[in-house]
Amino acid sequence: MQFYLDFEKPLVELEQKLSELRDYSTDEVDFSGEIQRLEKKAEKLRREIFSNLNRWQVTQLARHVNRPFTLDFVEHVFTDWFEVHGDRNFRDDPALVCGFARLDGQPCAVIGHQKGRDTKEKVYRNFGMPNPEGYRKALRVMQMAEQFGLPIFTFVDTPGAFPGIGAEERGQAEAIARNLREMAALKVPVIVTVTGEGGSGGALAVAVGNRVLMMENAVYSVISPEGCAAILWKDGAKGPVAAEALKLTAGDIQNLGCVIDEVIPEPLGGAHSDHKAAAEQVRICLKKHLDDLKDLSSDELREQRYQKLRAMTMVQE
């Protein structure tokens, strides 16, 4: 699907010219000199654009429709994927995918939010907003992983938990709270990666980990910029102003010193521009952190998780 953001438009137009020149170039008509000139210009422009993004532009990138989702990472990072469906209580939730796979031969559990790219898939995936049955399915898979001694990898990319009446009636708050409690006590390594939007409790319900990683152009916040603007100024259009105040980018979160452990670099132009390259960076980081955790005892893993949560409550005067 061809989609680009407003600030990407000059780069997209330049790349379209390059594509046309390559198509027209033949043995009789040589455009190689012009092509090389435009390639250098495009590379320079790409660096200028993506090295000077403001917080609102990063938020837009985090929501990019072509950004890799959980199943894209499953395809490029893991092997032998086997998806698990249903919470054994109500129904399956396509907004949260869960299953088992291998990371470089190591069996593991994989859990993550899943959005859609076209209208039909977006509706099917509920725009990446899980119902309580999604969180209960995730907990079911985490408990299975614990039973078999498998590490757990979770991928966070959601605007938040679904706030519908049915979701509330089926215990949305209870499902999130239970996941927070149970994840803190798991006896196996848990590695969390915020890949796109890390939206409030809907993100936290699968984000209590020994390691929390964040992709370079992801965001992590208690509320969306538009939601914050609507509350503070009664105007959702002031989202860009709210984004600056929320300090929700990977760099901002890393500066807090206790929420995330590493920022995963993305290809120049964003993860949506090259899924394979983005996934390879994720794979390298996951493997590195798993190697750091694999020899820890269950008590050490739980204590580490506990201390990580405690550090977030420290107040600087």
UniProtKB/Swiss-Prot annotation:
GO terms for molecular function: acetyl-CoA carboxylase activity; ATP binding; carboxyl- or carbamoyltransferase activity. One of its GO terms (cellular component) is acetyl-CoA carboxylase complex. Its EC number is 2.1.3.15. Residues 37-292 form the CoA carboxyltransferase C-terminal domain. Acetyl-CoA carboxylase is a heterohexamer composed of biotin carboxyl carrier protein (AccB), biotin carboxylase (AccC) and two subunits each of ACCase subunit alpha (AccA) and ACCase subunit beta (AccD). It is found in: Cytoplasm. Pathway: Lipid metabolism; malonyl-CoA biosynthesis; malonyl-CoA from acetyl-CoA: step 1/1. It is an enzyme of class 2 (transferase). It catalyses: N(6)-carboxybiotinyl-L-lysyl-[protein] + acetyl-CoA = N(6)-biotinyl-L-lysyl-[protein] + malonyl-CoA. Pfam families: ACCA. GO terms for biological process: fatty acid biosynthetic process; malonyl-CoA biosynthetic process. Component of the acetyl coenzyme A carboxylase (ACC) complex. First, biotin carboxylase catalyzes the carboxylation of biotin on its carrier protein (BCCP) and then the CO(2) group is transferred by the carboxyltransferase to acetyl-CoA to form malonyl-CoA. Keywords: ATP-binding, Cytoplasm, Fatty acid biosynthesis, Fatty acid metabolism, Lipid biosynthesis, Lipid metabolism, Nucleotide-binding, Transferase. PROSITE patterns: COA_CT_CTER. Belongs to the AccA family. The keyword Cytoplasm applies. This is Acetyl-coenzyme A carboxylase carboxyl transferase subunit alpha. Its main location: cytoplasm.
